[in-house]
């Protein structure tokens, strides 16, 4: 099981690979290697063993130095007098130098142990103690060490160079000291014709110093002066590194390369034309400027004239410094690699990759597979030739066979190993064991020829790393193994969507397409290399070393290389267009590696038949005409035949002179290796007369038979990828709540914007969020009102209990008339309460069912509303306008508009619990009005018909009483005001005979819900009831006073979803229970969820239906009432008649009655707090569950109640869907708007802070990609404050700009001017140090153009400041250049 910490470190390291930023793994590992007896802060010297090794990795060597060390080198000389008891003398040892520190560490053969230590400083003192000059060993700091054979040279920070000789027994002596340099020496190198370990001792030494000079020293001379000095005439450019080139001796030259602080690479030839050496060289032979900053290191390739340089500009450049004219005229490096940090040191590997080591099994296994296939009887001759070429292909490209390593500045504890085959990703990354930066490193020579790196870190620790056994070393990581082989991108410029694919074992190499005459002068002709480069089937395989080891891949390669035209030409019936190889060009192929032109192909040297052209990568040659397109041939396919198709696939000449039918295939010519000439490079199918020798072209290819890496662009018709819609939405969406708007208004506005670009789902999402926000707003208001109403319950009950105003109020005739309002435009279907039809539907308006609704009613309602508004602000039912039709499409919109218009009204801001409490108190108050009631005497001679009419009027009053209950959402004061306005006319009461009836008769007949003739005395009503009866008997009077009536029906709650399927049964049960309630009996309904719900429901139902059927129809229009377990006459005392008491007694009884009723109210408060049970049993009986939940669940806290339509739940679903669909725009806009609303990071579960940051950063990146920079900046500025710091860091990107001189066209580095400029002065690229001229001033103001505010004219080339040119062209409306050149720009 891998370590999770290690996996996290690996994943974090992959982020450095973006934009060619490589390296990784800042991880500290425990020290598990062997060490010397040197004391360190983390290790005890007594616990170390000099020759001990780590138990986990026996190949790893660790040594801790006593002092600060800074440089390292390898001593390749035998120490047989010091190291004994070995079959072979160890030849490779270690030298470490530092501050007053210079040691030689002798190793065993496999370099896993340090067997002896030699202090060079102490040894040299004992030998030359009598010498006054040579015994001075007051070292300060060893800066560089170089060794060859038995000679060691070290240079100090003071400029002193010391040369030592080492004997076989380890004794050292100081032989030379050179002190001609005046500053620190940065580089040393020996000059020898044969740079091998067993050669004779070197006799020449070069040194490069910070004083800007390179000096040549003759070790054989007794003089301490240099033989030759190289310096610059213009200025002293410090030399960072210099090296002798061993490859230039073939041309009898002595070449030295150096890199300087100016970033220049200089090439010097020390030989004079007359022989010998030049004494002083001031001008280099060649000079290249590859780096924009100081170049810090260089190293020459072991086999070819290529040099690699690294600098502070985070670039690695590879350049051919040979004398070939092809390379002399180049101004850019052959290869350039971007690194993630400034390069401090860079070195080529001493061994190529194709040399198998003892631990390398993949290479040997691959060779075994090749050999087994080569001598297999089933293998054809063509396949054998292919295998033979593939076996030798690895040693034909030395530039690609060598790795190179680089270390970095800025405290980076890594060393990256690269190869040009996969130059953008390092092969290995070495991390420091102590998490300290590396001070120095080198490639170590060893007898096993393995890739081994020696390092020293700033923790003064030496460590050896074997890259061939990296699997067992936790400090060596291969990033390529952790990367995917497929990458993709949206809107990359090639298409809506594109992806790049490349196998991990496919590496680059160089193959020359041309003949041998165009090779570099320094290259010797290699027949095998010519074979690989000239063969069309093998050109793509040159330089291949990392072969796949599986047999299936090998079989694929062999079969791909052995294709011939016989399968096409002999099977004419099976030929298809897809099987014909077609040349691709730059116009129709989006690949960075295009297929080669067919005129460059040559015949394979090992085949007699013509092969079809293989699809391989090459550089397109514009000098050669492409072949005729296939489409023109296919149009004439019927007349031309199959021969034209064959010619199109094999005719590589590109000649347009011959017709399609006229050119026939020419016989194939065998080409021997010795016959490689310029003329033999002609294509087989081309015309000799039209042949022209192509210019020299080289190409970089992949070692496979298909283009690699290849890119696949796609154009996908995705609605979410609409560029026009994206731009409109990003420009017009509101992402902040402006002044005068609310979040609801912003959502509705964004909904209209989304609908404008046919984003209807997004439009609906915004609208739903707007409705949910409004619902949350009213829920919060109702909750706050409920909290405040708890303190008014007792006072409200007392207020409604004291109804003395009924006795003294004589101005209530108009209010009395209002209770008789029954003229509402209800349809017959509305009897089912929205089961079918609408509540206020006018579908039956022609029948005038339910009475005629006159226009005067509306006017009177408006007058009453205005009258109420003139006085103190009291809620009246006329303030709420009834809706016309619930089934209309605009019903929901009307509901939303009405709720908005009345959001400040206390009528709609009350909770349902308050409705019940106020309704109960109103019922209680209505019973107290019976202190002065009079019952209708049954002795007045009224018949049964009249009694029935009276009972019907009672039913109508019961309806009105129920309507009053429905509208008891008013405050206590408002309800009291309406109760005080109830009509009580004494004169009208005396017009009819009254008599106080017996209450016992009433109780006996309450279950029937009707009034029989024998029980007409038992209906105990007051003056209000009598007045109602008289109005019902006088229709004219009813119509006369109906204009003052209230229209209460609009406050009913409606079933918006129309899903109550059992409404008929509920209405039947409600009718019976309502009749019971109208008679003063509490009809108890069982509560849903109670333990005895089933039994109680059965008992209630059976007791209700066992009674006689009522005389009148309870479902008569206008008699709709809500059932309640609280009786309308709750608290009414039996056998009590206030009319027979004295006024004082009546007053006392009323007060006592009020106190009793107050006690009863307080006892029932708990029952009324249970909203869900109360709604089911009393308030919302007959509604669906969804309607009850929407309209009634308002008593709890809005934050604790679960409502699926709450904003946070709807927003969560919308964000999840948008993120799955890839709609980053919607996710980002919702995040900005609702981040503070949901309090993300505190108690929100909709989205996290990390998700918000990801959405916004990706949205800003997309805006940058689409060049909507102003929108991106606006999004960053409007982001939540918590995300703004992180988002600003992600959105900001560094831009590297290079400026070139407008006169000499050279790069403006200006290092010299920078050093002269003061720290407080701002330095701009307006002056060129190379040509010592100032750049062009602004053409308008004639001031220097500094910074980025420069605009260049498209035609005349003049430039100026942005503000100046804007003033000239826009403000002054000019169209020509302000420089007077009369060039029309606009």
Curated annotation (Swiss-Prot):
<feature type="repeat" description="WD 1">
    <location>
        <begin position="180"/>
        <end position="227"/>
    </location>
</feature>
<feature type="compositionally biased region" description="Polar residues">
    <location>
        <begin position="1006"/>
        <end position="1016"/>
    </location>
</feature>
<dbReference type="Pfam" id="PF00400">
    <property type="entry name" value="WD40"/>
</dbReference>
<feature type="region of interest" description="Disordered">
    <location>
        <begin position="991"/>
        <end position="1021"/>
    </location>
</feature>
<dbReference type="GO" id="GO:0061700">
    <property type="term" value="C:GATOR2 complex"/>
</dbReference>
<feature type="region of interest" description="Disordered">
    <location>
        <begin position="31"/>
        <end position="58"/>
    </location>
</feature>
<feature type="compositionally biased region" description="Polar residues">
    <location>
        <begin position="884"/>
        <end position="928"/>
    </location>
</feature>
<keyword id="KW-0677">Repeat</keyword>
<feature type="repeat" description="WD 4">
    <location>
        <begin position="382"/>
        <end position="428"/>
    </location>
</feature>
<feature type="compositionally biased region" description="Basic and acidic residues">
    <location>
        <begin position="1148"/>
        <end position="1157"/>
    </location>
</feature>
<feature type="compositionally biased region" description="Polar residues">
    <location>
        <begin position="669"/>
        <end position="690"/>
    </location>
</feature>
<protein>
    <recommendedName>
        <fullName>Restriction of telomere capping protein 1</fullName>
    </recommendedName>
</protein>
<keyword id="KW-0479">Metal-binding</keyword>
<dbReference type="GO" id="GO:0005774">
    <property type="term" value="C:vacuolar membrane"/>
</dbReference>
<keyword id="KW-0862">Zinc</keyword>
<feature type="zinc finger region" description="RING-type; degenerate">
    <location>
        <begin position="1338"/>
        <end position="1381"/>
    </location>
</feature>
<dbReference type="GO" id="GO:0016239">
    <property type="term" value="P:positive regulation of macroautophagy"/>
</dbReference>
<feature type="repeat" description="WD 3">
    <location>
        <begin position="290"/>
        <end position="329"/>
    </location>
</feature>
<dbReference type="GO" id="GO:0005829">
    <property type="term" value="C:cytosol"/>
</dbReference>
<dbReference type="InterPro" id="IPR001680">
    <property type="entry name" value="WD40_rpt"/>
</dbReference>
<feature type="compositionally biased region" description="Low complexity">
    <location>
        <begin position="649"/>
        <end position="663"/>
    </location>
</feature>
<feature type="compositionally biased region" description="Polar residues">
    <location>
        <begin position="1090"/>
        <end position="1121"/>
    </location>
</feature>
<dbReference type="InterPro" id="IPR036322">
    <property type="entry name" value="WD40_repeat_dom_sf"/>
</dbReference>
<keyword id="KW-0926">Vacuole</keyword>
<feature type="compositionally biased region" description="Low complexity">
    <location>
        <begin position="859"/>
        <end position="872"/>
    </location>
</feature>
<dbReference type="GO" id="GO:0008270">
    <property type="term" value="F:zinc ion binding"/>
</dbReference>
<dbReference type="InterPro" id="IPR015943">
    <property type="entry name" value="WD40/YVTN_repeat-like_dom_sf"/>
</dbReference>
<feature type="compositionally biased region" description="Low complexity">
    <location>
        <begin position="595"/>
        <end position="606"/>
    </location>
</feature>
<keyword id="KW-0863">Zinc-finger</keyword>
<feature type="region of interest" description="Disordered">
    <location>
        <begin position="595"/>
        <end position="629"/>
    </location>
</feature>
<dbReference type="GO" id="GO:1904263">
    <property type="term" value="P:positive regulation of TORC1 signaling"/>
</dbReference>
<dbReference type="InterPro" id="IPR019775">
    <property type="entry name" value="WD40_repeat_CS"/>
</dbReference>
<keyword id="KW-0853">WD repeat</keyword>
<comment type="similarity">
    <text>Belongs to the WD repeat RTC1 family.</text>
</comment>
<dbReference type="InterPro" id="IPR037590">
    <property type="entry name" value="WDR24"/>
</dbReference>
<feature type="region of interest" description="Disordered">
    <location>
        <begin position="844"/>
        <end position="958"/>
    </location>
</feature>
<dbReference type="InterPro" id="IPR001841">
    <property type="entry name" value="Znf_RING"/>
</dbReference>
<feature type="repeat" description="WD 5">
    <location>
        <begin position="1171"/>
        <end position="1212"/>
    </location>
</feature>
<comment type="function">
    <text>May be involved in a process influencing telomere capping.</text>
</comment>
<feature type="repeat" description="WD 2">
    <location>
        <begin position="234"/>
        <end position="278"/>
    </location>
</feature>
<feature type="compositionally biased region" description="Polar residues">
    <location>
        <begin position="31"/>
        <end position="56"/>
    </location>
</feature>
<feature type="compositionally biased region" description="Polar residues">
    <location>
        <begin position="1134"/>
        <end position="1145"/>
    </location>
</feature>
């Amino acid at each position: 099981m891998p370590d999770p910490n290690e996996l996290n470190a690996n994943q974090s390291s992959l982020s450095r690979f973006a934009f060619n930023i490589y390296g990784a793994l800042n991880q500290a590992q425990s020290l598990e290697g062997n060490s010397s007896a040197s004391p360190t802060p983390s290790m005890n010297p007594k616990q170390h063993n000099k020759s001990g090794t780590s138990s986990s990795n026996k190949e790893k060597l660790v040594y801790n130095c006593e002092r600060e060390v800074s440089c390292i080198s390898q001593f390749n000389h035998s120490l047989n007098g010091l190291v004994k008891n070995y079959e072979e003398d160890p030849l490779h040892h270690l030298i470490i130098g530092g501050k007053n520190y210079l040691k030689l560490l002798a190793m065993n053969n496999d370099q896993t142990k340090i067997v002896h230590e030699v202090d060079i400083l102490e040894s040299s003192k004992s030998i030359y103690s009598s010498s006054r000059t040579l015994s001075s060993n007051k070292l300060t700091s060893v800066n560089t060490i170089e060794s060859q054979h038995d000679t060691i040279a070290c240079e100090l920070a003071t400029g002193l160079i010391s040369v030592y000789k080492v004997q076989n027994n380890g004794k050292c002596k100081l032989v030379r000291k050179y002190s001609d340099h005046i500053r620190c020496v940065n580089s040393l190198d020996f000059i020898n014709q044969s740079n091998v370990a067993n050669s004779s001792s070197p006799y020449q030494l070069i040194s490069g110093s910070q004083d800007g000079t390179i000096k040549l020293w003759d070790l054989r001379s007794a003089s301490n002066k240099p033989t030759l000095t190289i310096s610059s005439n213009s200025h002293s450019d410090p030399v960072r590194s210099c090296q002798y080139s061993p490859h230039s001796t073939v041309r009898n030259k002595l070449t030295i390369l150096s890199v300087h602080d100016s970033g220049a690479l200089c090439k010097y030839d020390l030989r004079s034309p007359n022989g010998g050496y030049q004494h002083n060289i001031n001008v280099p032979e060649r000079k290249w400027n590859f780096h924009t900053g100081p170049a810090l290191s260089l190293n020459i390739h072991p086999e070819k004239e290529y040099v690699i340089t690294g600098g502070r500009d985070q670039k690695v450049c590879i350049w051919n410094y040979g004398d070939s004219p092809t390379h002399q005229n180049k101004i850019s490096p052959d290869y350039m690699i971007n690194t993630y940090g400034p390069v401090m040191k860079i070195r080529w590997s001493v061994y190529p990759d194709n040399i198998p080591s003892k631990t390398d099994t993949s290479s040997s296994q691959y060779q075994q597979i090749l050999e087994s296939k080569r001598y297999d009887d089933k293998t054809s001759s063509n396949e054998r030739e292919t295998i033979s070429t593939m076996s030798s292909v690895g040693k034909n490209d030395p530039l690609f066979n060598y790795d190179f390593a680089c270390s970095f500045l800025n405290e980076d504890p890594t060393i990256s190993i690269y190869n040009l085959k996969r130059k953008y990703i390092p092969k290995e990354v070495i991390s420091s064991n102590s998490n300290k930066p590396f001070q120095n490193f080198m490639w170590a020579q060893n007898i096993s020829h393995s890739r081994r790196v020696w390092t020293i870190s700033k923790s003064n620790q030496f460590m050896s790393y074997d890259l061939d056994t990296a699997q067992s070393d936790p400090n060596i990581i291969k990033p390529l193994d952790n990367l995917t082989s497929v990458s993709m991108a949206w809107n990359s410029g090639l298409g809506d969507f594109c992806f790049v694919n490349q196998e991990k074992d496919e590496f680059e190499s160089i193959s020359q397409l041309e003949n041998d005459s165009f090779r570099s002068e320094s290259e010797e002709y290699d027949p095998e290399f010519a074979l690989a480069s000239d063969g069309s089937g093998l050109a793509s395989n040159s330089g291949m070393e990392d072969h796949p080891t599986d047999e299936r891949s090998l079989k694929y390669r062999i079969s791909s290389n052995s294709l011939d035209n016989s399968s096409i030409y002999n099977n004419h019936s099976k030929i298809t267009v897809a099987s014909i190889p077609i040349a691709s060009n730059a116009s129709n192929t989006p690949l960075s590696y295009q297929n080669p032109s067919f005129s460059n192909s040559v015949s394979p040297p090992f085949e007699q038949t013509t092969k079809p052209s293989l699809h391989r990568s090459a550089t397109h040659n514009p000098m050669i005409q492409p072949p005729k397109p296939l489409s023109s041939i296919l149009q004439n396919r019927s007349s031309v035949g199959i021969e034209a198709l064959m010619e199109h696939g094999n005719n590589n000449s590109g000649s347009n002179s011959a017709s399609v039918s006229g050119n026939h295939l020419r016989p194939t010519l065998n080409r021997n290796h010795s016959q490689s000439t310029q003329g033999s490079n002609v294509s087989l199918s081309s015309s000799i007369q039209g042949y022209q020798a192509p210019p020299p072209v080289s190409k970089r290819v992949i070692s496979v038979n298909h283009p690699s890496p290849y890119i696949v662009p796609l154009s996908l018709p995705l609605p979410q990828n609409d560029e026009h819609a994206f731009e409109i939405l990003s420009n017009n969406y509101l992402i902040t709540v402006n002044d005068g708007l609310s979040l609801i208004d912003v959502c509705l506005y964004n909904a209209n914007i989304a609908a404008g670009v046919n984003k209807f789902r997004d439009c609906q999402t915004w609208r739903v969020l707007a409705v949910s926000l409004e619902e949350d707003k009213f829920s919060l208001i109702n909750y706050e009102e409920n909290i405040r109403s708890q303190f008014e319950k007792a006072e409200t009950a007392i207020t409604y209990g004291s109804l003395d105003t009924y006795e003294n109020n004589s101005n209530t005739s108009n209010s009395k008339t209002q209770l008789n309002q029954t003229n509402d435009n209800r349809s017959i279907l509305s009897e089912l309460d929205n089961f079918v039809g609408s509540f206020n539907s006018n579908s039956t308006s022609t029948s005038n069912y339910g009475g005629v609704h006159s226009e005067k009613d509306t006017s009177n309602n408006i007058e009453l509303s205005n009258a109420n508004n003139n006085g103190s602000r009291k809620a009246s039912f006329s303030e709420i306008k009834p809706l016309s039709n619930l089934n209309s499409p605009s019903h929901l919109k009307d509901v939303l508009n009405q709720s908005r218009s009345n959001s400040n009204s206390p009528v709609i801001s009350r909770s349902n619990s308050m409705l019940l409490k106020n309704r109960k108190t109103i019922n209680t108050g209505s019973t107290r009005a019976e202190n002065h009631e009079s019952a209708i005497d049954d002795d007045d001679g009224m018949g049964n018909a009249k009694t029935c009419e009276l009972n019907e009027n009672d039913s109508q009053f019961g309806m009105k009483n129920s309507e009053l209950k429905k509208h008891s959402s008013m405050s206590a004061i408002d309800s009291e005001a309406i109760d005080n306005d109830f009509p009580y006319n004494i004169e009208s009461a005396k017009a009819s005979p009254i008599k106080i009836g017996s209450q016992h008769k009433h109780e006996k007949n309450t279950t029937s819900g009707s009034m029989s003739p024998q029980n007409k005395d038992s209906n105990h009503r007051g003056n209000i009831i009598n007045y109602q009866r008289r109005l019902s008997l006088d229709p004219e009077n009813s119509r006369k006073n109906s204009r003052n009536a209230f229209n209460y029906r609009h406050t009913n709650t409606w079933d918006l979803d129309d899903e109550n399927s059992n409404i008929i049964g509920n209405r039947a049960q409600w009718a019976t229970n309502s009749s019971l309630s109208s008679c003063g009996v509490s009809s108890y309904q069982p509560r849903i969820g109670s333990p005895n719900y089933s039994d109680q429901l059965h008992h209630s139902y059976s007791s209700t239906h066992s009674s006689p059927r009522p005389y009148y129809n309870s479902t008569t229009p206008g008699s709709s009432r809500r059932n309640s377990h609280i009786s309308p006459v709750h608290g009414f005392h039996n056998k009590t008649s206030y009319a027979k008491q004295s006024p004082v007694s009546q007053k006392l009884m009323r007060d006592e009655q009020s106190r009793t009723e107050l006690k009863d109210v307080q006892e029932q408060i708990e029952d009324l707090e249970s909203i869900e049970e109360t709604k089911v049993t009393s308030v919302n009986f007959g509604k669906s569950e969804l309607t009850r939940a929407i309209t009634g669940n308002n008593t709890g806290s809005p934050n604790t109640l679960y409502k699926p339509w709450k904003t946070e739940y709807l927003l969560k679903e919308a964000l999840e869907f948008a993120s799955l669909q890839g709609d980053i725009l919607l996710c980002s806009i919702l995040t900005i708007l609702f981040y503070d609303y949901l309090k993300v990071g505190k108690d929100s579960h909709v989205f996290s802070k990390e998700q918000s940051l990801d959405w916004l950063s990706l949205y800003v990146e997309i805006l940058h990609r689409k060049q909507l920079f102003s929108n991106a900046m606006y999004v960053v500025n409007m982001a939540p404050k918590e995300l703004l710091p992180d988002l600003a860091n992600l959105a900001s990107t560094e831009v590297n700009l290079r400026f070139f001189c407008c006169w000499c066209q050279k790069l403006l580095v200006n290092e010299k001017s920078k050093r002269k400029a003061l720290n407080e002065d701002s330095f701009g690229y307006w002056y060129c140090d190379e040509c010592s001229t100032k750049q062009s001033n602004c053409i308008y103001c004639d001031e220097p153009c500094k910074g980025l505010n420069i605009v260049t004219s498209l035609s005349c080339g003049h430039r100026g400041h942005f503000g100046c040119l804007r003033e000239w062209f826009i403000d002054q409306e000019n169209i020509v250049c302000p420089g007077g050149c009369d060039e029309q720009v606009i």
